[in-house]
């Protein structure tokens, strides 16, 4: 495994709030992608009481070459998970929550119904909490998209992860254009939902391929794009092709805004839910400003 440049080195997680968060997740038997995927930002985020909860168990039915989450035959769904999630959020007094999941290709709806139950349970306790969900592709199972659009999370996120040319090696069980369809369908069925997608760089893609992904996401009416450095979790995972410089990330950010995204997060340590609460507020402000400009131009 290649040594990391200085701009990717982070401090070991510590602090009272960090341990409080970890203990609370254990108390309510909740999984987090922060731990399962070995996110480099876990210390910073947990000390701010930001966490991305991972529902539908801790075992994924796929084995993507970039992901550190365990794969295999998953356990049965925990019927108490929605209630436990809502209790934990209430205990932490969160204002914005991010929910993601493993892939559950074994379930009839891919797990979409469980996302709905979690969202409804959270809103029963506090309907002022804003909710962002990061979902798998549900294997294009019937009714999954309708369920998600109907429950209306504030932000719907589904990551394309990499450029189409690398899918066979990096995401062999996924299809790039199905991911685009999923994002476009959610926006079409409920235009009020902010849509979001992310891509990793440093896997061997070219700049031109990144620009094409940006264009494809804008064609799918995606509002928010995240761009971050791929980091190899273990020697068994896909090898890092190169470390993209902070200056290149700044360039990607400039290009993405020029293509019409409402919000862009681009940097070496950017992940799907990094600074999610702050970015959601900026996203709302940017949409309001865009609508005001459009109204002004129509007068």
Curated annotation (Swiss-Prot):
Its EC number is 2.8.1.8. [4Fe-4S] cluster 2 binds at residues 60, 64, 67. SUPFAM superfamilies: Radical SAM enzymes (SSF102114). It is found in: Cytoplasm. CDD domains: Radical_SAM. Belongs to the radical SAM superfamily. Lipoyl synthase family. This is Lipoyl synthase. The gene is lipA.
């Amino acid at each position: 495994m290649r040594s990391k440049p200085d701009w990717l080195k982070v401090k070991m997680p510590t602090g009272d709030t960090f341990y409080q968060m970890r203990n609370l997740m254990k108390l309510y038997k909740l999984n987090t992608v922060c731990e399962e995927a070995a996110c480099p930002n876990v210390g910073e985020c947990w000390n701010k009481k930001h966490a991305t909860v991972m529902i539908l168990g801790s075992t994924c039915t796929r084995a993507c070459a970039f992901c550190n989450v365990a794969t295999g035959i998953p356990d049965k769904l925990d019927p108490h998970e929605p209630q436990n999630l809502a209790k934990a959020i209430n205990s932490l007094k969160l204002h914005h929550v991010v929910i993601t999941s493993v892939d559950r290709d074994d379930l009839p709806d891919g797990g979409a119904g469980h996302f709905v139950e979690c969202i409804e349970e959270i809103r029963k306790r506090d309907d002022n909490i804003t909710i962002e969900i990061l979902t798998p592709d549900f294997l294009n199972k019937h009714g999954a998209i309708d369920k998600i659009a109907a429950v209306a999370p504030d932000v719907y996120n589904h990551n394309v992860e990499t450029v189409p040319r690398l899918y066979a090696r990096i995401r062999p069980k996924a299809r790039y254009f199905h991911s685009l369809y999923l994002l476009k369908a959610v926006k079409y069925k409920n235009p009020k939902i902010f849509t979001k997608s992310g891509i990793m760089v440093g896997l061997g893609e070219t700049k031109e391929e990144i620009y094409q992904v940006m264009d494809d996401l804008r064609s799918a009416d995606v509002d928010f794009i995240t761009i971050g450095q791929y980091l190899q979790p273990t020697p068994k995972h896909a090898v890092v092709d190169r470390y993209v410089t902070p200056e290149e990330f700044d360039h990607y950010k400039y290009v993405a805004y020029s293509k019409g995204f409402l919000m862009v997060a681009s940097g070496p340590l950017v992940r799907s839910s990094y600074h999610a609460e702050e970015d959601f507020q900026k996203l709302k402000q940017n949409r309001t400003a865009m609508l005001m400009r459009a109204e002004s131009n129509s007068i």
